[in-house]
Design a protein with these regions (language model features):
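N-terminal membrane-anchoring/stem segments of glycan-assembly enzymes
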Residues: 1-58
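Internal catalytic domains of large membrane-associated glycosyltransferases
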Residues: 46-183
Length: 183
């Protein structure tokens, strides 16, 4: 028994030395990155990019869809939708909010926030929630695909968004511009 304990203590010490070595390598790596950034800032080679005034309000190059799965998000989903509509005024934006049939508070909050804006579509899932977020997103994707088939236009970008997060006014334009450069 004493022999086994000795081997375990030796193994523990070797494992600690191994972990300490790689921790120090990671520390040196992070410290080098921080020093490089500081040197670039002090020499004026690293600058913070400034977006031009009005960036983010330009028309999109194609349609953009935002998919928002929501279950028991009545307290936040209305604010998220209202903020998104105000921050992203582009008419080629479509917001799909996925709710569940057994969550009337979230359905009501999403519908109230959408008011009469045709860019927002509240999609009520046919099964009782909660299911997985992926299941709700799949339901939203099917609704989006049905809208594409009906209208004959395809979405150039599909953005997944959380019900409680706010958007930056320039984010949609930046995504659109990056996709145009990529394609």
């Amino acid at each position: 028994m004493q022999d086994l304990l000795g081997w375990l203590m030796l193994f523990e010490r070797e494992l600690l030395a191994f972990a300490a070595f790689w921790f120090c390598v990671g520390l040196i790596d992070e410290f080098a990155i921080d020093l490089t950034w500081l040197w670039l800032r002090l020499t004026g080679r690293a600058r913070t990019a400034q977006l031009p005034v009005g960036y983010g309000a330009e028309p999109l190059s194609g349609q953009a869809a935002v998919l928002i799965p929501a279950f028991q998000e009545a307290a936040v989903v209305g604010t998220t939708i209202a903020h998104m509509l105000a921050a992203w005024p582009q008419p080629d934006l479509a917001i799909y909010v996925g709710c569940y049939r057994n969550d009337p508070a979230t359905v009501a909050a999403a519908s109230a926030a959408a008011e009469s804006d045709v860019r927002v579509r509240v999609v009520v899932h046919g099964v009782a929630g909660p299911t997985t977020k992926a299941d709700c997103l799949n339901r939203l994707y099917r609704a989006m695909a049905a809208d594409e088939a009906r209208s004959g236009r395809t979405f150039t970008s599909v953005i997944l968004h959380d019900a409680e997060d706010m958007v930056h006014p320039a984010a949609l334009q930046a995504i659109d511009a990056a996709l145009v450069l990529r394609d």
